[in-house]
Structure formats: C-alpha cells, structure tokens
C-alpha cells in the first residue's frame, strides 16, 4: 500500500508543470552538501545525479561526495545510496546522468551501446551485480547529458533500457539535457528516435538563452504530439555558467509566457548547490507555483538623500524627486526649472532664492496591469550662487534633465526625473555619474550680445 502511494506521488510529481529539476554532484556552488540534505531542504522534485562521466568503462564523479571504491576501482558510494532511498521515500525522483561537458565516454557502435544497457540496469537499476555503486538503492531512470557531438549508440541504448524498464516493479524515466539550439548536435538523434519523458533544455551558454534569441517555440513544436515534458534549463548563479544567468523578474516573465504550453514541465537548474545560495531555488519555485509575484511598487517615491560631490574645490548638492503614475495608454514628459522669474532672480540672487515659481515634479505614466493614480511631490527650491550676473562671476546655475530611468522594481515601468543643481565654475561632471542614469549638464554660457545691453542699461538708469 505504501509503495503504491509513493508510486502515485512520483507520477503526480513528474506530470506537474510546477516542477523543479536540479542537478547535483558537481559542486558548482562551492559548498555542496549531501544529496539527503537537498532532498530535505529544497523544493526540487527531481534530482539528477551528475555524473557517470566514463563509459562503457565505468567512471563516476560526484566532486566532494563519495570517496569509497570497490577493489576494481569503481566508486562505492554507500552514503549516496542511503540518501537515494530516503529521497524516494519523500517522493523525489532520482535520475543518474550520463556524460557531462567533460569525461571519457561514447560508443563505437549500436551493439556496444545495447550491451552497456545491461550494465546500467544491473549496477544502478533493478538488476543484480556484485558491485553496485549505490548498494541496493535503485535509481528512477537515466539522463543523457551528452555534449561531445558524437551521437553513436544513444538511441539504441535508450531503446534497450526501455525493455529492461518493462520488467521492473516501478516506474522508470528517460531524459535528455540538450543545448538550446535546435536540433541538438549531441542528442538530436536520440530525441527524434526515442520517446523520452523529460528534456532539461540548457537555455544558457548559447545565443538562445532567455535574454537573447529565446527559442522555446522550436522546442514546443518538437514536443507536439509527444508525451515529453520540456524544462526551462537555467544556471543556478552567474558563476555556474559562462553566460545566460538571469534575474527572477526575467524568469517570471518567461514562465508566464510559456506556462500555458501543454509540454511545459517546469524549471531545471544547474546546479542545486549554486541555486541554494541566496535562496534563488526557492524563488524559482514560488515563481512556478504563482506565489512569487513581486509586491506592487509604490506609485510615489520620496527624494533621495541629497548627494554632495566636490570637483576642483567647488561643491554641489542635489536632491532627486520622482513621481510615477500608472495610467494605461498615457504619455510622459519632463520639465526643468528655467522660467523667467528664476532667470531674473539669478541676476541679483543671494545664497537663498526667494522665487516661488518652481518646476512641477516630473510625472511619468506607463501601462501596467493594475493602474493606480499618479501622485506628485513638491520639488526643492533651486539655489543660485551669490551675485551671479549672466554667469560672469563665481557660480553657474545649471538645470539638468536626466534621461529615461528604468526602475529596478519588478514591474514594467519607465520613470523620469527632473534634477536641479547648483554647481561651481569648475563643475564639469554630472553629480550622478555613478548612478544608473546618464545626465547631460548644459550650463549657461556668456553671449557676446549681452555686452550691448550694458550701455543701454546705464542710459536708462541715468
């Protein structure tokens, strides 16, 4: 009865579209824990042991796990075997992955591959052998992570494994881990000739990653009419892949766009030790289950703490006020402090300006799923350096309009800011050169025509 419940649980897990499949064994995160630890603490429902990186002459590699050997030199991993059984009792599906990016593996012919199927079944499956690396633990299937572009024998191997599976007393699975370019150069024949259960597609280290030329449709078309489940393969951190790591907001956007695909099975991760760091794995699970949506951003922001920067002995201070509105279909614009009264005040201004006409805080409006009313925030008063006639003397009043700011809050929005600064005569750089925006300052320049205005002013005053 208990065995039947476990089998039913395993079947329901692999049929779900909210699965996390995680590779374990290569310590990509640098502090790999035991298999049992991850089964108990992580939301992963499928864990793939990596790797059986040598065959037909067997060689296992689990990085900092498993140091025992049989007399033949084959790895003897009793702890992993014990953990496999514990994981399976918790409803986890455990696969053994063949291949990897490095290793010494491959077949010279289909017949050699068919013969090797018996070795896999007897040493890791439901068969019998005097040297079983995981003792009496039986894996739930095999994964083909072939990356050497030699496709000889793998379709024959998988076909023969299916025959062995049919004699077993539980469900077994076959999977592949293709690179995202379709068709894959190493397992393309296998995937076209054999019915597989899962494809853990590596959408990283290639041009077809999520933030580039994402090609899910190519794989979805391949899966049409098949029972295979496609997994969105991601690196667990920026250090666990050469390229292709993306933030949670990108994953959420992509998952939302493909979750309705009947072939979508979930997310696969390389690898679990790196994805556990910082809680990324749990965030991915929440994104899949629908509970990981970011909180709606506030529609107004208080000004940043004034920033003070010094260049060439001159000091400048500025505060940025942001007002964001979310109104579908509207437009956006910006204004700066540059009216007539402000100009007149700058001619005879003291260190504190008394002008009451100031720029309206900039409002940016853009479409979002949940519109809210736009708000405004009072802008700070502009200041001007003392006795600043036409920019002839010590200071120059500069009005700076920032370019578009793309907010880091997890929503699709565009924010515009208006920034008013008072700068010294030697102030040449933007106050915000280290920020996530680019400011272009345009200072008031002395025009030669003003020289004609001085005699006229003297005549009027006399």
Swiss-Prot record:
Coiled coil: none annotated. One of its GO terms (biological process) is septum digestion after cytokinesis. It comes from the Eukaryota. One of its GO terms (cellular component) is fungal-type cell wall. Glycans are attached at residue 57. Keywords: Carbohydrate metabolism, Chitin degradation, Chitin-binding, Glycoprotein, Glycosidase, Hydrolase, Polysaccharide degradation, Secreted, Signal. GO terms for molecular function: chitin binding; endochitinase activity. Residues 1-17 form the signal peptide. Disulfide bonds: none annotated. Pfam families: Glyco_hydro_18 (PF00704). Residues 18-291 form the GH18 domain. Its main location: secreted. The active site is at residue 147. InterPro entries: Cts1-like, Glyco_hydro18_cat, Glyco_hydro_18_chit_AS, Glycoside_hydrolase_SF, Glycosyl_Hydrlase18_Chitinase. It catalyses: Random endo-hydrolysis of N-acetyl-beta-D-glucosaminide (1->4)-beta-linkages in chitin and chitodextrins. It is found in: Secreted. The keyword Lyase does not apply. Belongs to the glycosyl hydrolase 18 family. Chitinase class III subfamily. PANTHER family: ENDOCHITINASE. This is Chitinase 1. It comes from Candida albicans (Yeast).
């Amino acid at each position: 009865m208990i065995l039947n419940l476990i089998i039913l649980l395993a079947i329901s897990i692999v049929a779900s579209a909210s699965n996390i499949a995680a590779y374990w064994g290569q310590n990509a995160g640098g502090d790999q824990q035991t298999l049992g630890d991850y089964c108990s603490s992580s939301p992963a429902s499928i864990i793939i042991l990596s790797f059986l990186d040598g065959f037909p002459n067997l060689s296992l590699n689990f990085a900092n796990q498993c140091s025992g050997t049989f007399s033949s030199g084959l790895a003897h991993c009793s702890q992993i075997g014990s953990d496999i059984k514990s994981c399976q009792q918790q409803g986890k599906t455990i696969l053994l992955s063949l291949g990897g990016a490095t290793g010494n593996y491959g077949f010279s012919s289909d017949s050699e591959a068919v013969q090797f199927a018996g070795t896999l079944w007897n040493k890791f499956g439901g068969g019998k052998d005097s040297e079983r690396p995981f003792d009496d633990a039986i894996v739930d299937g095999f994964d083909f992570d072939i990356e050497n572009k030699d496709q000889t024998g793998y379709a024959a191997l998988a076909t023969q494994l299916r025959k062995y599976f049919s004699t077993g007393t539980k469900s077994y699975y076959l999977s592949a881990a293709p690179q995202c370019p379709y068709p894959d150069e190493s397992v393309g024949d296998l995937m076209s000739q054999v019915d597989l259960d899962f494809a853990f597609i590596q959408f990283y280290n290639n041009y077809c990653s999520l933030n580039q030329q994402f090609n899910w449709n190519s794989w979805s078309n391949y899966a049409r009419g098949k029972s295979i489940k496609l997994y969105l393969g991601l690196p667990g951190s920026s250090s666990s892949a050469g390229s292709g790591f993306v933030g949670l907001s990108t994953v959420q956007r992509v998952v939302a766009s493909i979750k309705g695909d009947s072939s979508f099975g979930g997310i696969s991760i390389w690898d679990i030790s790196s994805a556990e760091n910082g809680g990324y794995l749990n965030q991915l699970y929440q994104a899949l289950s629908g509970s990981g949506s970011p909180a709606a951003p506030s529609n107004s922001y208080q000004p940043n703490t004034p920033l003070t920067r010094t260049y060439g002995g001159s000091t400048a201070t500025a505060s940025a006020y942001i007002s964001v509105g979310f109104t579908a279909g509207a437009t956006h614009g910006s204004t700066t402090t540059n009216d007539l009264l402000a100009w007149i005040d700058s001619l005879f201004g003291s260190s504190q300006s008394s002008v009451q006409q100031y720029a309206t805080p900039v409002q940016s409006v853009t479409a979002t799923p949940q519109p809210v009313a736009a708000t405004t925030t009072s802008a700070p008063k502009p200041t001007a350096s003392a006795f600043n006639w036409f920019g002839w003397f010590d200071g120059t009043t500069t009005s700076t309009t920032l370019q578009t700011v793309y907010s880091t809050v997890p929503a699709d929005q565009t924010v515009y800011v208006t920034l008013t600064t008072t700068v010294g005569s030697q102030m040449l750089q933007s106050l915000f050169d280290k920020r996530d925006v680019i400011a272009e300052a345009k200072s008031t320049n002395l025009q030669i025509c003003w020289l004609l205005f001085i005699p006229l002013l003297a005549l009027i005053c006399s």
